[in-house]
Swiss-Prot record:
GO terms for cellular component: plasma membrane-derived thylakoid membrane; proton-transporting ATP synthase complex. It is found in: Cellular thylakoid membrane. Belongs to the ATPase B chain family. This is ATP synthase subunit b. The keyword Transmembrane helix applies. F(1)F(0) ATP synthase produces ATP from ADP in the presence of a proton or sodium gradient. F-type ATPases consist of two structural domains, F(1) containing the extramembraneous catalytic core and F(0) containing the membrane proton channel, linked together by a central stalk and a peripheral stalk. During catalysis, ATP synthesis in the catalytic domain of F(1) is coupled via a rotary mechanism of the central stalk subunits to proton translocation. InterPro entries: ATP_synth_b/b'su_bac/chlpt. It comes from Prochlorococcus marinus subsp. pastoris (strain CCMP1986 / NIES-2087 / MED4). Disulfide bonds: none annotated.
Length: 170
């Protein structure tokens, strides 16, 4: 058997520095020096460009989100201002309606009271007048209590129209 001869034939990598050819080592080192930086450089450059692109995209989205937030804040403040104005207007209108209703109720009570004095059934008329007054006051109080929660523009206009029609009928 010739085992030492078998080990020296064929392709193999000899890592013993003293037994290898210095020229082979120089070719390998030059190849690594020449091609490895270009290969790694291209990979790193592509990765860097990808990261920069993602950062720019994220900055653009942040800018858009910031602009949308500012617009939403502006819209909210305008809506709050408009709601405050509507509430103030509805309170003014409800107060004027209440005052007008009270005035009409007082005038009506005075008329009823005057006719009750001259009439035989003045006691019954006074009781009815008192009940009407209390009913009107209770209805006005109840309406005023529930008015801010339910009163929008169209409902308010309908209420004013109904009140005027009711007063004109009486």
């Amino acid at each position: 058997m010739n085992l030492p001869l078998l080990a020296t034939e064929g392709f193999g990598l000899n890592l013993n520095l003293f037994e290898t050819n210095v020229l082979n080592w120089a070719v390998v080192v030059f190849g690594l020096y020449k091609f490895l930086p270009g290969f790694l450089g291209k990979m790193l450059q592509k990765r860097r460009e990808g990261i920069l692109l993602e950062l720019k995209d994220a900055e653009d989205r942040l800018l858009k989100a910031t602009q949308a937030l500012e617009k939403a804040k502006t819209d909210l403040s305008l809506a709050e201002e408009k709601a405050g104005q509507i509430k103030a207007d509805s309170l003014k209108r409800s107060e004027s309606i209440r005052m007008e209703s009270e005035k009409k109720a007082i005038e009506e009570m005075a008329r009823i009271k005057q006719s009750a004095i001259s009439d035989e059934s003045s006691e019954a008329s006074r009781a009815i007048s008192q009940l009407r007054k209390e009913a009107v006051e209770l209805a006005i109080k109840k309406a005023l209590d529930s008015l801010p929660n339910r009163l929008d523009q169209t409902t308010q206009e309908n209420l004013v129209t109904q009140s005027i029609n009711n007063i004109e009928m009486n």
